[in-house]
Structure formats: C-alpha cells, structure tokens
C-alpha cells in the first residue's frame, strides 16, 4: 500500500546523506537532492541557501519533500 511504501522510504532516507542537485533556496522556493537512487524536492531546515553538489543530511520528511542541513 502507499502508506507502507512511505514508511519504507522514510526509513531509507531519514538521517541519510544526500547530494544537492538543484540550489536549495526556501525563499524562491527551489531545491532538490539525490539520495537512494532518486531525486527529491528539498528545503533547508535552517533556512540557509545550499548550492549544488553540497552534501547534506536529511533531517525530516513532510509528504514528498525532504528537509536537509549541510553536513559538517
């Protein structure tokens, strides 16, 4: 079912490392990351702009949008 799929995806990506493929700017709003073989819409959990190719960590998921922060 769709709910089981969403739970599986959540388990796979939460806390995971992703590569930014489209500049993340919450004001526009734009942003995408690549993780686990798929590209996802993304927003910055801190509000900072994150440039393409930066590595980020997935903090939370709302619907099909990932909230990320830059890796240290």
Predicted segments with their positions:
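Terminal membrane-proximal soluble interaction domains of membrane-associated proteins
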Residues: 10-72
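Short boundary/loop segments of OB/S1/cold-shock single-stranded nucleic-acid-binding domains
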Residues: 1-13
């Amino acid at each position: 079912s769709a709910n089981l799929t969403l739970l599986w995806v959540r388990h796979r990506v939460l806390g995971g490392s992703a590569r930014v493929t489209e500049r993340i700017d919450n004001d526009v709003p734009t942003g995408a990351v690549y993780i686990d073989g798929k590209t996802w819409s993304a927003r910055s959990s801190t509000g900072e702009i994150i440039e393409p190719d930066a590595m980020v960590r997935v903090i939370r998921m709302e619907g099909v949008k990932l909230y990320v922060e830059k890796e240290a």
